[in-house]
Amino acid sequence: MKVLVTGGGTGGHIYPALAVINELKERNQIVDILYVGTSKGMEQEIIPNRGIDFAAITVRGLQRKINLEQVYFLRDFLKGLYQSYRLIKNFTPDVVIGTGGYVCGPVLMAASLMKIPTVLHEQNVIPGITNKFLSRFADYTCVSFPESKNYMTKAKKIITTGNPRAQEITSRDFSSVNKHLNLRSDLKTLLIVSGSRGAQKINETMINIIPELISKFPIQIIYVTGNNYYESIRSQILEYVDNSYQDRLKLHAYLSDLPAAISCADLVISRAGATTLAELTAAETPSILIPSPNVTNDHQRVNAKILGERGAAKVLTEDSLNEQEVIKSISSIINDEEVLFDMQRATKEISYPTAATEICKILESLI
């Protein structure tokens, strides 16, 4: 079985692809994988480090405004299309799957023109411009949220599978996480995630409320500040938080295994990226979501809205974020066992614990 996988730019496209690759290897004794990305995206480092064959093509993002960049886009698209044709001809895949990002455009188009079966996966409720276009040609379009079907009305065939990243969470054993993170079993755990680089507004708010949270509530806090803010936050926190409470505050610039922390948390405060939501629902962890306003199509707000409407999350907006509202939201959830239970049940109802398996079944059916 030979599978060509493409998707890149950000972890939100790469990690779902890796989840599918891992499941394919579990299901098939012999599977040959080629991952096609770009030399500028995160995939050019992540994929080879996983021992997966990698090839890069030329691609450029499409500008929505009419300008000279669109000429360059067309030039690079045609170049990428030719490069994709050569790669596909040499590799001869049985099926091609794309998980989003501009690199999917020329790769899936070339595969489609060469009559090779193609599958597309969309992680967000609102599809990216590339995936929306490609859904017209892909044999199957797999979506993480059923609501995505409203935005991909011209898709040939669309099916809700969930995000394959979720299956990697449900299949793991997290029994030793509490000990590894040095957490107490007699306290509720609040996980605050500001992103890999950090989010200024979230961090500014958290710095001011953590001393009150940790002194008033029987909780322990894991706070992932982001690399850009760690040193300044650490110095301020040590100044504001009483020494007697500091053992209940775990500060990290970055956590390499964030799903492990999510799995042992009682409540998570985070952005609303697609991968994060897949991890939250897979771990059945309630959340307070603060969508980033700086993303294309405002997709984090729409993602968060789905969880909020189904009772799995409380949604706050960054532009109206204030300290007392955050404290009130945390208290109303983490100090109420009934609310926690209801939110946990809601996350379970919208999780897709076998997403990677379902996608692999589709890939296998096309061969």
From Swiss-Prot:
Annotated Pfam families: Glyco_tran_28_C, Glyco_transf_28
Major localisation: membrane
Topological type in the membrane: Peripheral membrane protein
Positions that bind UDP-N-acetyl-alpha-D-glucosamine: 10-12, 124, 196, 300
GO terms under biological process: carbohydrate metabolic process; cell division; cell wall organization; lipid glycosylation; peptidoglycan biosynthetic process; regulation of cell shape
Classification via NCBIfam families: murG
Function of the protein: Cell wall formation. Catalyzes the transfer of a GlcNAc subunit on undecaprenyl-pyrophosphoryl-MurNAc-pentapeptide (lipid intermediate I) to form undecaprenyl-pyrophosphoryl-MurNAc-(pentapeptide)GlcNAc (lipid intermediate II).
Database matches in HAMAP family: MurG
GO terms assigned for molecular function: UDP-N-acetyl-D-glucosamine:N-acetylmuramoyl-L-alanyl-D-glutamyl-meso-2,6-diaminopimelyl-D-alanyl-D-alanine-diphosphoundecaprenol 4-beta-N-acetylglucosaminlytransferase activity; undecaprenyldiphospho-muramoylpentapeptide beta-N-acetylglucosaminyltransferase activity
Family: Belongs to the glycosyltransferase 28 family. MurG subfamily.
UniProt pathway annotation: Cell wall biogenesis; peptidoglycan biosynthesis
Domain of life, source organism: Bacteria
Species, as recorded: Natranaerobius thermophilus (strain ATCC BAA-1301 / DSM 18059 / JW/NM-WN-LF)
Name the record gives this protein: UDP-N-acetylglucosamine--N-acetylmuramyl-(pentapeptide) pyrophosphoryl-undecaprenol N-acetylglucosamine transferase
Annotated catalysed reactions: di-trans,octa-cis-undecaprenyl diphospho-N-acetyl-alpha-D-muramoyl-L-alanyl-D-glutamyl-meso-2,6-diaminopimeloyl-D-alanyl-D-alanine + UDP-N-acetyl-alpha-D-glucosamine = di-trans,octa-cis-undecaprenyl diphospho-[N-acetyl-alpha-D-glucosaminyl-(1->4)]-N-acetyl-alpha-D-muramoyl-L-alanyl-D-glutamyl-meso-2,6-diaminopimeloyl-D-alanyl-D-alanine + UDP + H(+)
Gene that specifies this protein: murG
Keywords: Cell cycle, Cell division, Cell membrane, Cell shape, Cell wall biogenesis/degradation, Glycosyltransferase, Membrane, Peptidoglycan synthesis, Transferase
Subcellular location: Cell membrane
